[in-house]
C-alpha cells in the first residue's frame, strides 16, 4: 500500500465500509412519499408507475455514484520478487477453485464432535467500497470474508475490517489424514485436503477440499508472502 501507514489505511477502509449512502436513502424516501401522494390524490396509474420506475432507477444510480465517491483507493506497485510471490498465490487459488467443492468448517456442534460446514467458492474480488489496481483472491469464512492482498489479509465482518500481516499468519495445508491437532471435522472420503488459517489477532478459519495438492499449494504460497 502506498503513501500511508497500515493503521491509517485500515481507519480509512473502516470509514468507507461503515458509511451509508445517505443521499440515496433521502431520495428514496422523497420519491416514495411522492408516489404515495400521487396515488392518494388520484394520479393516473400509468403515470404513477412510470414515475416510480424512474425514481427507482434514479435511486440506484445515485447510490452507486455515492458509494463510488466515498470508496477508498488502495494502489499497489510490486517489485519483481513480490510480483512472483503474489502470482503464485493467485495461481494456487485458481487451482483450488477448480479442484472440486470447498467447505468452510465453522464452530463445533453441541455434541462437540462435528462442525457446521458451508460450501464456499474462491473468487477474485475487492472488499466493499475499495478501489484498487488489482483484484485479489477472496474466500468466505462464516460471517467473515478474507481478502488476500499482496501485503496482508484484510478480514471483513459485519461490523468492521481488520488486517493480518502474512508474517503473523499461521497457516497449514495438505492432507488431513496426516494431522491430528487441528480437529479438522471428521473423515470425509471425498475431502481429504485441508487449509487452516490462524493468527493471534483472532482469525481462526478451517477449510476442507477434495484436492490435497491444491490446498498445500495455497498454504505454501501464503508462507511465501511472509
Walk through the language-model features, giving the residues of each.
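Conserved mid-sequence domains
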Residues: 157-176
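Conserved beta-hairpin
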Residues: 128-163
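Acidic, Ser/Thr- and proline-rich intrinsically disordered linker/docking segments
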Residues: 3-4, 76-80, 84, 170-226
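N-terminal topogenic membrane-targeting module
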Residues: 1-13, 53-135
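Hydrophobic, membrane-inserted alpha-helices
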Residues: 27-37
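Hydrophobic alpha-helical transmembrane segments
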Residues: 36-54
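Juxtamembrane interface helix immediately N-terminal to a transmembrane segment
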Residues: 10-29
Amino acid at each position: 500500500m502506498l503513501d500511508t501507514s497500515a493503521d491509517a489505511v485500515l481507519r480509512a477502509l473502516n470509514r468507507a465500509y461503515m458509511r451509508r449512502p445517505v443521499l440515496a436513502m433521502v431520495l428514496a424516501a422523497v420519491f416514495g412519499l411522492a408516489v404515495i401522494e400521487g396515488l392518494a390524490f388520484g394520479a393516473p396509474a400509468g403515470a404513477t408507475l412510470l414515475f416510480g420506475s424512474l425514481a427507482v432507477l434514479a435511486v440506484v444510480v445515485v447510490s452507486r455514484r455515492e458509494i463510488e465517491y466515498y470508496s477508498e483507493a488502495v494502489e499497489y506497485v510490486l517489485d519483481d520478487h513480490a510480483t512472483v510471490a503474489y502470482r503464485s498465490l493467485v495461481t494456487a487459488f485458481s487451482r483450488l477453485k477448480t479442484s472440486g467443492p470447498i467447505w468452510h468448517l465453522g464452530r463445533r456442534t453441541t455434541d462437540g464432535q462435528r462442525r457446521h460446514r458451508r460450501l464456499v467458492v474462491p473468487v477474485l474480488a475487492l472488499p466493499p467500497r475499495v478501489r484498487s489496481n488489482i483484484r485479489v483472491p477472496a474466500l468466505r469464512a462464516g460471517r467473515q470474508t478474507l481478502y488476500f492482498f499482496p501485503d496482508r489479509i484484510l478480514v471483513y465482518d459485519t461490523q468492521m475490517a481488520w488486517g493480518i500481516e502474512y508474517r503473523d499468519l499461521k497457516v497449514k495445508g495438505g492432507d488431513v489424514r496426516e494431522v491430528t491437532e487441528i480437529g479438522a471435522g471428521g473423515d470425509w472420503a471425498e475431502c481429504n485436503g485441508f487449509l487452516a488459517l490462524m493468527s493471534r489477532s483472532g482469525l481462526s478459519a478451517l477449510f476442507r477440499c477434495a484436492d490435497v495438492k491444491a490446498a498445500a499449494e495455497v498454504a505454501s504460497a501464503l508462507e511465501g508472502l511472509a
